[in-house]
């Protein structure tokens, strides 16, 4: 079977590895010459994503490119601790969440794909007028080309288009942050501020990786560091971290996508952000899960068409539930003064008594054995 993968980011590279493991001939076409390296900001891989990477044989190599983050702490704008829970895992899971640069995850997945025998062609942009020619001769076409997916528009002309979600992110790295702020390496700190949420994590070497997620009903005209410093000048830890910034990543506007009604047509299939941008710290993990589930279906079903029907059936409900969780996550960040006060009253109760029950469905997913030979 010949497979064409459109997009060589996390979803595309993971798909290439997974499909090679079940015997497909795989070609990946990627618009950018080098989508790895320092491109993009940092991301987290939760327990479910790391187990999916284990199915690809990549978990250890990927983990080595980042650092473990065992705990997550939520803070109110006043400095009150709202919750202290395991980060991206259930308390009984011995494998900690891993944080790393997005580009380094892509590098590891692409290297694994090449070692497995996939061909990766970079610098080739696929457009609506060229995708048919690119796909000629392929038995399976995988649309892993992100939230602005050309494949999605080609597959279903009436597919929804992304819209701005009312949040943008400015992120970077700080050095020599005051000790009381940077005291605990490996803790994912999320501070709910007057303007959204501010995340900071102290890496093993003492650098602080940070991300300011700022609410703005309209697309912002100014995403500079100075503008973000001004927004957070009264915010304690965020202000201290921003004041020590030494590197910035490219700012990002967050977009949402209404449910895509058509994921596949018997030959072409969407996965990752092309099908369901979820955010909420699960974008990469969900993309890797998609890749593993798709490859398992290809191996076990009698035809590509049957495999794609099964993939759609097995992924829809989980992804829809994740999308609802992501929406609730955004709502917490965009709450007004009254909403923030209510959240500060409710969150300590939730994290103390209900967190594990509420997240068990997400973090307990185990695809680590999904591609083992039967």
Which functions belong to the PLM regions below?
Residues 11, 34, 148:
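Conserved Rossmann-like nucleotide-cofactor binding loop
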Residues 8-21, 29, 142-143, 248-332:
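Conserved mid-domain beta->alpha element of the FAD-binding
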Residues 83-86, 90-97, 101-106, 173-251:
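Conserved FAD/dinucleotide-binding core of flavoprotein oxidoreductases
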Residues 64, 79, 279-281, 296-374:
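C-terminal helical "tail/cap" subdomain of flavin- and related membrane-associated enzymes
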Residues 1-3, 46-156, 160-175, 215-226, ...:
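Conserved N-terminal helical subregion
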Residues 20-41:
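Glycine-rich FAD pyrophosphate-binding loop
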Residues 3-5, 26:
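Conserved hydrophobic helix-helix packing surfaces used for dimerization/oligomerization
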Residues 149, 169-171, 196-199, 275-276:
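Histidine-centered metal-chelating micro-motifs
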């Amino acid at each position: 079977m010949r497979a064409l993968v459109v997009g060589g980011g996390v979803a595309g590279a993971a798909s290439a590895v997974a499909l090679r493991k079940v015997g497909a001939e795989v070609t990946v076409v990627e618009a950018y010459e080098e989508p790895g390296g320092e491109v993009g900001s940092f991301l987290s891989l939760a327990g479910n994503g790391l187990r999916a990477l284990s199915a690809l044989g990549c978990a250890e190599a990927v983990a080595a490119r980042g650092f473990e983050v065992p705990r997550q702490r939520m803070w109110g704008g006043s400095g009150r601790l709202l919750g202290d829970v395991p980060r991206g895992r259930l308390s009984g899971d011995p494998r900690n969440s891993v944080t790393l640069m997005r580009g380094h995850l892509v590098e590891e997945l692409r290297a694994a794909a090449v070692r497995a025998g996939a061909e990766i062609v970079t610098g080739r942009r696929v457009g609506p007028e060229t995708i048919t020619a690119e796909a000629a001769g392929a038995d399976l076409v995988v649309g892993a080309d992100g939230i602005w997916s050309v494949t999605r528009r080609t597959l279903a002309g009436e597919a929804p288009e992304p819209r701005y979600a009312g949040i943008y992110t400015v992120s970077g790295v700080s050095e020599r942050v005051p000790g009381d702020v940077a005291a605990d390496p490996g803790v994912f700190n999320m501070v709910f501020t007057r303007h959204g949420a501010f995340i900071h994590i102290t890496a093993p070497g003492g650098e602080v990786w940070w991300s300011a997620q700022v609410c703005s009903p309209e697309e912002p005209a100014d995403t500079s560091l100075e503008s973000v410093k001004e927004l957070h000048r009264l915010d304690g830890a965020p202000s201290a971290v921003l004041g020590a910034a030494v590197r910035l990543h490219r700012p990002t506007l967050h977009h949402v996508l209404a449910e895509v009604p058509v994921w596949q047509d018997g030959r072409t299939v969407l996965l990752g952000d092309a099908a369901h941008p979820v955010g909420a710290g699960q974008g990469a993990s969900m993309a890797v899960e998609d890749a593993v589930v798709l490859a398992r279906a290809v191996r076990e079903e009698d035809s590509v068409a049957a495999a794609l029907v099964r993939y759609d059936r097995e992924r829809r409900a989980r992804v829809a539930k994740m999308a609802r969780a992501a929406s609730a996550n955004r709502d917490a960040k965009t709450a007004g003064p009254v909403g923030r006060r209510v959240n500060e009253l409710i969150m300590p109760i939730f994290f103390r008594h209900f967190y594990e029950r509420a997240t068990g469905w997400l973090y307990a997913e185990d695809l680590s054995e999904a591609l083992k030979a039967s």
